[in-house]
Structure formats: C-alpha cells, structure tokens
Amino acid sequence: MPYFVVVRERGSAWDWSVPMRRQAEWDSHAAFMDALDAEGFIVAGGPLGTEDAAAHVMHIVNAPDSETIEARMAEDPWTPMELLKTVSIEPWTVLLGGFRER
C-alpha cells in the first residue's frame, strides 16, 4: 500500500492561548489518532515545529488512495469542530530510510 504525506493546519476554532493538549475535546481527538496509529493507518506524525506553537501537523499515512485519507480525517472529532483541517495530501515516493519498500 502506498504512503502519503498529509498536512493539516489549525483551524478557525483553535484557541492559541491554550496548549494543544488542553484544546476542546483533546481526549476524543487523541483517542481517534491513537486508534489510527494502532491500526497502521498513520505510521508517523505530529506537529511541525514546537508542539504548542506549530500551525501545521504532518502525518505519514499508509492508505490505498487520497479519498480514503480524506474520509478518515473527516472522522476526527476536531475536523467538524474546525480545530484542524486537511490542507494537502501528497503521494510519497520513499527512496531512503525505513519506510521504503525493500
């Protein structure tokens, strides 16, 4: 199954005065992301830059296509709350490192 790089950014409802782990519905969002990790859908991910100052989050996703990724990210509790939104989904050709096919 191919890899994709998914970039999400903080949405209009993000409260910049509050740390990431204290945003509304953090526990629900974290449980959702942990489940995607456990099933191997997300193989790596996290904020770009320092955790609480980062405007963007990057994930390496193992999925058949971008439509599947869009559908799964829409299930994140933070998506309809406008805390996070997906801004790009790009196929990733891995040439170096542990993610490449051998």
Summary of predicted features, one role per range:
Residues 1-102:
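Conserved, structured core segments of small domains
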